[in-house]
Swiss-Prot record:
The lineage of its organism: Bacteria, Bacillati, Bacillota, Bacilli, Lactobacillales. It holds the Pfam family NusB. The gene is nusB. GO terms for molecular function: RNA binding. This is Transcription antitermination protein NusB. It comes from Streptococcus pneumoniae (strain 70585). NCBIfam families: nusB, PRK00202.1-1.
Length: 140
């Protein structure tokens, strides 16, 4: 059985990913986080979890740096723009969590893979796994 904290963080990562996708189409961090967090709740007047806001605002603040780090791990001839928005945002979220949080690296990688399975396909999940695993290996 999954612990409540892990389940909660997993759900917040999902909300963070949804907020990041929303930000691709023009909104602000708080609005994107609020919608992602409350869209399926009856009570929408809630305080947003700090973990959610920290993830989304952190990825947004370091977007260019994260993209450079991701690009360094792409195959020759590939650019960040060639990736789908889903893959880009999952990789940004994964790299940000690996480099900026105390989350164990393997947990951050696994969570990104699970999100890829939910929002994309197995091919994308394998790609996310490969790139983030390479990133973790080279960072050690």
């Amino acid at each position: 059985m999954t612990s409540p904290l892990l389940e909660s963080r997993r759900q917040l990562r999902k909300c963070a990913f949804q907020a990041l996708m929303s930000l691709e189409f023009g909104t602000n961090v708080e609005t994107a986080c609020r919608f992602a967090y409350t869209h399926d709740r009856e009570d929408t007047d809630v305080q947003l979890p700090a973990f959610l806001i920290d993830l989304v605002s952190g990825v947004q603040a370091k977007k260019e740096e994260l993209d450079k780090q991701i690009t360094q791990h792409l195959k020759v001839g590939w650019t960040i723009e060639r990736l789908t928005l889903v893959e880009r945002n999952l990789l940004r979220l994964g790299v940000f969590e690996i480099t900026s949080f105390d989350t164990p690296q393997l947990v951050a990688v696994n969570e990104a893979i699970e999100l890829a399975k939910d929002f994309s396909d197995q091919k994308s999940a394998r790609f996310i796994n490969g790139l983030l695993s390479q990133f973790v290996t080279e960072e050690q």
